């Protein structure tokens, strides 16, 4: 049996700037190690609706 696979979980990140502007949000799914990164993840990703890179925040 594989050891240590239970620490990495799949999360969804959502654009924060599109919500403020009233435009459709973009969502990405990625993985994170919950042992090393306990706080919410913030990444800069491309939002095709706004046609620019924006801050994406982890959602539950």
UniProtKB/Swiss-Prot annotation:
SUPFAM superfamilies, sorted: Zn-binding ribosomal proteins
InterPro entries membership: Ribosomal_bL33, Ribosomal_bL33_sf, Ribosomal_zn-bd
Organism: Chlorobium limicola (strain DSM 245 / NBRC 103803 / 6330)
The UniProt record lists the keyword Membrane: no
Keywords, alphabetical: Ribonucleoprotein, Ribosomal protein
GO process annotations (BP): translation
HAMAP family referenced in this protein's UniProt entry, alphabetically: Ribosomal_bL33
Family per record: Belongs to the bacterial ribosomal protein bL33 family.
Superkingdom assignment: Bacteria
Listed GO MF terms: structural constituent of ribosome
GO CC field: cytoplasm; ribonucleoprotein complex; ribosome
Protein name, as recorded: Large ribosomal subunit protein bL33
């Amino acid at each position: 049996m594989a050891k240590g696979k239970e620490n990495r979980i799949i999360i969804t990140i959502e654009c924060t700037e599109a919500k403020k502007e009233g435009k459709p949000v973009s969502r990405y799914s990625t993985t994170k190690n919950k042992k090393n990164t306990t706080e919410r993840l913030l990444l800069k990703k491309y939002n095709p609706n706004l046609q620019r890179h924006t801050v994406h925040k982890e959602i539950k």
